[in-house]
Amino acid sequence: MKIIHILIASFLLPLVCSGQNPIIQTKYTADPAPLVYNDTVFLYTSHDEDDAFGFKMQDWLLYTSTDMVNWTEHGVIASLKDFRWVPYDNGAWAPQCVRRNNKFYLYCPMPNGIG
């Protein structure tokens, strides 16, 4: 009987642990970096194209919300192409945005440690 309870629990546990309100449902993203300013959450993510074998990350995206339920996509906010000195077309990893002295700075790590 104990084994039956364990089996039932092992099948039900994934249902309870799954996300009930995924923020981004139409694109592949990674490395979410939230920033709260006034009454808005700004969510910066790296963007993985779905047409590649492995990964193809060339740009960064922005999403915002004032209630953490409804999100607005603002599209690409920066791309590897924006940095002429970057000789790569893949590797747009984990962004981070910070506010300092009433200015916002988007930190974008570059491939192979050149940034």
Question: Model-derived features: where do they sit?
Answer:
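Bacterial Sec-dependent N-terminal signal peptides
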Residues: 1-20
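Carbohydrate-active catalytic/glycan-binding domains of CAZyme proteins
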Residues: 17-115
